[in-house]
């Protein structure tokens, strides 16, 4: 399967912190699935060059996590600024999904969207205005059926591509164990807007 308006674009960012007014994007990764969550393609995994000042401003958790993963050194070695990483990501996505067709998919994706709006506005605007946020299902499962959470664990490497793969796997888990969808073609199984 190739280019389709039904494909879903999954995205994850690693940042120097959580505040888009003071923190910066240091890694971006994307992948594309079909509507049934089969991975069709993995996009470029890009370390985004940032100043030493931005890296030095990271808190202890970010410094440790991104240092241990090797991301800080990849950021220092990167030749890509935010505009170049945005352009390369858009070039990949345009081969798979028409503009404004896919919701932005991922975990706590609103946070990523805030950073895209600030630092990669063309990429943020390329997505549909809706979000497919796996963390919503996690929160609901925790409140309504906590046993569902026991069947899935994440490595939480805080490496963008691995985090996206885990988000897709997590949504597959919730589809199988929490959403309990009727069989394909069953009454009431149509798509709603």
Curated annotation (Swiss-Prot):
Q: Which GO terms describe its molecular function?
A: 3'-5'-RNA exonuclease activity; nucleic acid binding
Principal location class = cytoplasm
User: Where's it found, cell-wise?
Assistant: Cytoplasm
Which enzyme type, at the first EC level?
hydrolase
**Metal-binding: is it a keyword of this entry?**
no
Concerning its family, UniProt says: Belongs to the oligoribonuclease family.
* Keyword Secreted on entry: no
Q: Give each disulfide bond as a residue pair.
A: none
Question: EC?
Answer: 3.1.15.-
GO terms (BP aspect): DNA metabolic process
Its function?
3'-to-5' exoribonuclease specific for small oligoribonucleotides.
Originating species: Alkalilimnicola ehrlichii (strain ATCC BAA-1101 / DSM 17681 / MLHE-1)
Give the protein name, as stated in the record.
Answer: Oligoribonuclease
Q: Which gene encodes it?
A: orn
Keywords from UniProt, A to Z, are: Cytoplasm, Exonuclease, Hydrolase, Nuclease
Any idea where the Exonuclease domain is? 8-171
Superkingdom, natural source? Bacteria
* InterPro entries from the UniProt entry: Exonuclease_RNaseT/DNA_pol3, Oligoribonuclease, RNaseH-like_sf, RNaseH_sf
Q: What does UniProt list as catalytic?
A: 129
What are the GO cellular component annotations?
A: cytoplasm
